[in-house]
Amino acid sequence: YNPYGSQWENMTWGHSTSKDLLHWEFQGEAIEPDVWGTIFSGSAVVDHNNTAGFGDSTVVAMYTTAGENQTQSLAYSTDNGKTFTKYEGNPVITSNTPDFRDPHMFWNEDIKKWNMILAEGQHMNIYSSVDLKEWTLESQFGAEYGNHGGVWECPDLMKMRVRGTDKYKWMLICNINP
């Protein structure tokens, strides 16, 4: 959101809390623009096993910084999300593609690694990491499939149980802009 007005600029992550998911209290800005650019969407995880080395049960956020190029950066919170410290090694993932954004991270228990899905142009990149800082591109999806009338963004990838069975399938959600 833009803390200074309703127009599109100064994109920042805000922080709000709720006890009932109906009534919300604004806690202030969580992650603000820096030399890499404004702060676009991303995701946050709780690093229960301290794989990143920031501390036990640290909240780790990955977000898109939108400057000259879109890059992926990390920030972490050791106080349950009240304040965030930007990782000194930012950005952690770069690309020369103009539309390179919206990281969604999750722990993959099957391979004992973090996974992330990230939109790049009109396809998705799937990465893995053992420490949330160094990421390896594992695969790409979508260049030959689906709708290509706009930029792919805000992906989600989740493992879901097939109803009535002991089997699981992966489900990909993708939004198209415009």
Can you annotate each of these PLM segments?
Residues 1-103, 107-154, 159-178:
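Beta-rich carbohydrate-recognition and catalytic domains
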